[in-house]
C-alpha cells in the first residue's frame, strides 16, 4: 500500500478572478509503514494537501494514486478509499455530530455497511484505545472538553480500521 502524489496542483476558485493557488506541482510518495510530518507556515497548503489524500477534494491538475490506482478514475471507489485513509480534521469539534459519544464513533463503521454489533464492538475498542472513560460514552460530545472531543474524533476514525491515519494539526488546541 502506498500513496503517491504525481505533480498535484490545487487552485481554489479556479477560472475566477479570485483564484488562489494552494498547491503547486507537488510530488510525494508515502510508502507503507512510514510516518511523515508536513511542516509549513499558516496558509502553505498542508490541510489542502491532506484533504486530497482521501479524496475529499479533487486536484486541479496532477494525479493521486492509492495502491497503484488513480483515485480520480471513474471506476475508483471513493468510499473504499475513505475507509482505508482516515482523516482527523484540525478542529475535531467540526466532525462530531451525533447525540452521544458512542453513536458518533459507531457512525463510520455503520456507514461502511457493518452490522450494528460489529460497529459497536469497533466503537468500544476505539474508545478504549484513546483512553476515554466509559462514563463518557453516552454523554453528548458537545459537553466534553477540547481534549476529550479530540479523542472522540480520533476514535471515530480508528473505529473504521484505516490502513493510513492522517492527523491534521494533531497538537493544535
Task: Give the predicted meaning of each segment.
Residues 39-41:
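The feature captures the beta-strand-to-loop junction immediately N-terminal to the Walker
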Residues 54:
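Helix-to-loop junction immediately C-terminal to a conserved catalytic motif
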Residues 62-73, 81:
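Conserved ABC transporter NBD signature motif
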Residues 117-135:
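Conserved ABC ATPase "signature" region
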Residues 140-144, 148:
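Conserved ABC ATPase signature
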Residues 161:
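Conserved catalytic motifs of ABC-family nucleotide-binding domains
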Residues 165-168:
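Catalytic Walker B motif of ABC-type/P-loop ATPase nucleotide-binding domains
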Amino acid at each position: 500500500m502506498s500513496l503517491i502524489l504525481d505533480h498535484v496542483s490545487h487552485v481554489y476558485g479556479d477560472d475566477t478572478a479570485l483564484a488562489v493557488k494552494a498547491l503547486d506541482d507537488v510530488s510525494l510518495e508515502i510508502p507503507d509503514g512510514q510516518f511523515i510530518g508536513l511542516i509549513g507556515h499558516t496558509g502553505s497548503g498542508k490541510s489542502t494537501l491532506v484533504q486530497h489524500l482521501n479524496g475529499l477534494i479533487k486536484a486541479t491538475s496532477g494525479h493521486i494514486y492509492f495502491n497503484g490506482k488513480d483515485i480520480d478514475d471513474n471506476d475508483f471507489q471513493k468510499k473504499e478509499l475513505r475507509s482505508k485513509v482516515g482523516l482527523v480534521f484540525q478542529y475535531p469539534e467540526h466532525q462530531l455530530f451525533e447525540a452521544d459519544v458512542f453513536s458518533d464513533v459507531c457512525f463510520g463503521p455503520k456507514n461502511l455497511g457493518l452490522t450494528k454489533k460489529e460497529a459497536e464492538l469497533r466503537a468500544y475498542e476505539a474508545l478504549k484505545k484513546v483512553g476515554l472513560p466509559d462514563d463518557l460514552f453516552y454523554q453528548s460530545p458537545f459537553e466534553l472538553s477540547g481534549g476529550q472531543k479530540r479523542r472522540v474524533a480520533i476514535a471515530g476514525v480508528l473505529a473504521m480500521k484505516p490502513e493510513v491515519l492522517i492527523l491534521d494539526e494533531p497538537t493544535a488546541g
